[in-house]
């Protein structure tokens, strides 16, 4: 079985928009030709698309950087530059995408073909044909292309198994999976033989089929990182039915009922919603001595926790090694799956509104002013820096336009209030100029 990569850290960068062009119409018999510079093309966006054929995040181990192409520059005759194609990145079903800096969930990719724009391409800069006015019919102004969005992301794969096997190490989960499916998990008589999830397709005699995941063994304290810890608890978040496998022979000296309670406590501690999933108790190793007596004691303790009118969890005595009781277990599992809906991983309120990434929040500051040790005033802020990088600093008219934009944003007034004097150095990024009062 292929290794399942649970998480991957990658960077994505959308393409920059193409620069607008400064050009003028110069043709014979056309006097006083006006501006003729076209707009730059848009930069390519980075789009994640779900491919149900992918089962792991293995590809992201070797390719961690994804960069879309930039748009082409504007041309003469008012022609626009060609926009860049979007970069499509294929991800498995069940991939959760988080912002690595904030930890917020950006999107949950669960449907085949689902697409989400992860990083938006930059807008193409406007050519000088766009800036013509009656007062300035021949402007030497053009914008640089807007930079594309850049992000650091964390990908997390939630296995899309219908049924998850949970239980203490060495209770027989791997053996059960190998017997009822074509999966070939590593099997051993020691703890944590399974260190990665194994998936197998199960088909019942009645023709029903479902995916079953043999998940690494849980121990008490797993939700706090003990043993194999929380990295594997996340795998059962998507399973619709949980098969709780218990070693009813108590071959390692533990009480079967205490095992049952301990594992359920870990599931509840990790995520309260896990306990909403229906559970079937699988009493394994029933071919071993004392298993029958232990099962009687288990049922008695379990019943004591319920009112007489409550429905007790289903219990199926089996032996994976002896192939006993498996057919009834699988048929009951298929029936339970048929009437169990999928569970949402997150409340809708936890998902980030995509608009928050493609616009500016009303409460966001347009700029910030700090002062370096060398007495230089430093201007920063997403909106201000965006205007700066889209300004062609090689043309005087563009610089004057940028100065007017700063004045309109209130930068000049804010500098005066902070004590800036005529001739003080001011810096935006690596560009430095003098403050003129």
From Swiss-Prot:
GTP binds at residues 167-174, 192-196, 214-217, 284-287, 319-321. Residues 359-437 form the OCT domain. Its cofactor is Mg(2+). One of its GO terms (cellular component) is cytoplasm. GO terms for biological process: ribosome biogenesis. GO terms for molecular function: GTP binding; GTPase activity; magnesium ion binding. It is found in: Cytoplasm. PROSITE patterns: G_OBG (PS51710), GTP1_OBG (PS00905), OBG (PS51883), OCT (PS51881). Its EC number is 3.6.5.-. CDD domains: Obg. Its main location: cytoplasm. Keywords: Cytoplasm, GTP-binding, Hydrolase, Magnesium, Metal-binding, Nucleotide-binding. It is an enzyme of class 3 (hydrolase). Mg(2+) binds at residues 174, 194. An essential GTPase which binds GTP, GDP and possibly (p)ppGpp with moderate affinity, with high nucleotide exchange rates and a fairly low GTP hydrolysis rate. Plays a role in control of the cell cycle, stress response, ribosome biogenesis and in those bacteria that undergo differentiation, in morphogenesis control. HAMAP family: GTPase_Obg. Belongs to the TRAFAC class OBG-HflX-like GTPase superfamily. OBG GTPase family. Monomer. This is GTPase Obg. It comes from Streptococcus pyogenes serotype M12 (strain MGAS2096). The gene is obg.
């Amino acid at each position: 079985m292929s290794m399942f990569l649970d998480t991957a850290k990658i960077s994505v960068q959308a393409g920059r928009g193409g620069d607008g062009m400064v050009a003028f119409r110069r043709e014979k018999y056309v006097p006083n030709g006006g501006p003729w510079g076209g707009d730059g093309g848009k930069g390519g966006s980075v789009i994640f698309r779900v491919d149900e054929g992918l089962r792991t995040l293995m590809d992201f181990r070797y390719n961690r950087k994804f960069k879309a192409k930039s748009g082409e520059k504007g041309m003469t005759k008012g022609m626009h530059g060609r926009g860049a194609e979007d970069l499509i990145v294929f991800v498995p079903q069940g991939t959760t995408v988080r912002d690595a800096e904030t930890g917020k969930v950006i999107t949950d990719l669960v449907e085949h073909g689902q697409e989400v724009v992860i990083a938006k391409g930059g807008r193409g800069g406007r050519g000088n044909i766009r800036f013509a006015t009656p007062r300035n019919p021949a402007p030497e102004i053009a914008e640089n292309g807007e930079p594309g969005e850049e992000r650091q992301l964390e990908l997390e794969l939630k296995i899309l198994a219908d049924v998850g096997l949970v239980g203490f190490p060495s209770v027989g989960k791997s053996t059960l999976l190998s017997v009822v499916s074509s999966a070939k998990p590593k099997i051993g008589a020691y703890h944590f033989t399974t260190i990665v999830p194994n998936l197998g397709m199960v088909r019942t005699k009645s023709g029903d089929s479902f995916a079953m995941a043999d998940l690494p063994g849980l121990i008490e304290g797993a939700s706090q990182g003990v043993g194999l810890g929380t990295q594997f608890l996340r795998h059962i978040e998507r399973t619709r039915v949980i098969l709780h496998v218990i070693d009813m022979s108590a071959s390692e000296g533990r009480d079967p009922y205490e095992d049952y309670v301990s594992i359920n406590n870990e599931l509840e501690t990790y995520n309260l919603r896990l306990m909403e999933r229906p559970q079937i108790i699988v009493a394994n190793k029933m071919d071993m001595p004392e298993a029958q007596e232990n099962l009687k004691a288990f049922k008695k303790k379990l019943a004591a926790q319920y009112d007489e009118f409550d429905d007790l969890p289903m219990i199926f005595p089996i032996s994976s090694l002896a192939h006993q009781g498996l057919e009834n277990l699988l048929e009951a599992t298929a029936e339970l799956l048929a009437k169990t809906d999928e569970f949402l991983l997150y409340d809708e309120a936890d998902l980030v509104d995509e608009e928050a990434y493609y616009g500016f929040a009303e409460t966001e500051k347009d700029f910030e002013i700090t002062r370096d040790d060398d007495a230089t005033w430093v201007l920063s802020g997403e909106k201000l820096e965006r205007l700066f990088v889209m300004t062609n600093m090689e043309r005087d008219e563009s610089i004057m336009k940028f100065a007017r934009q700063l004045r309109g944003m209130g930068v000049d007034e804010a500098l005066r209030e902070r004590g800036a004097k005529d001739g003080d150095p001011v810096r935006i990024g690596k560009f430095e100029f003098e403050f003129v009062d």
